[in-house]
Amino acid sequence: TRISYAYDIRIFFQFLLEQNPAFRDWSIDAFTVDVLDQITAVDLEEYEEYLKVYQAGDKTETNGERGLKRKMSSLRSFYAYYFKREMIHTNPTVLVDVPKIHQKSIIRLEADEVALLLDYIEHGGDDLTGQKKVYYEKNKDRDLALVTLLLGTGVRVSECVGLDIEDVDFKNNGIKVTRKGGNEMVVYFGPEVEKALKNYLEVRKNIIPVEGHEHALFYSTQRKRIGVQAVENLVKKYARQVTTTKKITPHKLRSTYGTALYQETGDIYLVADVLGHKDVNTTKKHYAALDDSRRRQAATAVKLRED
């Protein structure tokens, strides 16, 4: 946005005031376009280093790869504007590489962890007593249906909480979701999701919803449509009992589904379609490591000589 862009450029001039001896006695409103011609590629490299950790008033600001890339890209656009209009004679930003963003490996649950997670939601409260037991039993079927649906379809958490009861079609075992951009799509589910949903719907019949929330598929404990944050919290709560080394969120359950589907089918276009990615390159980028694994398998799949 324009505000973010202006903020990024202001940080650059703040850096010049604080770190560059040539501008130490200046004020920020003293800068004119000609100053840009005095800046060198070395200055910009120092600015990039500065951005990693710097003081902004009483706060310490930090930038990771994405933050660095955005701020350096903003500066490059700023210079390009004046250079193209011949208001400056040099453009040192083209001599400095824009920071690369390294893809993080996909965090997902392994097959045994998926089974443990669902088992824990289903039976984790068996040893509880008192009020904790009551609370667990009250939400168990809903939570199991929610997590099973996320794991079994790969829908986004926003799509999940937006579901109405009318969106569920047991005749064809599909749910109608509204994707990013407002497009509607039917996502199909298997027997495990069907069973979990039907069990929850039996419990749901006994809930009297708050007015205006009658159509919501999943209710909160306040008898309203459950929110994204509530689902985030319950997924994290259960996942902590299964793994302490992975930070599992609803989005990681989506990654778990996408990974399982790709490993099962090897069809990146199918995965992209089911996950609702408009651009298959988005899917390829996320599952590149899995592609590498398949390519390694291909290396030994063809024998040149029989043993």
Language model: regions and residue ranges:
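Conserved catalytic core of the tyrosine transesterase superfamily
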Residues: T1-D307
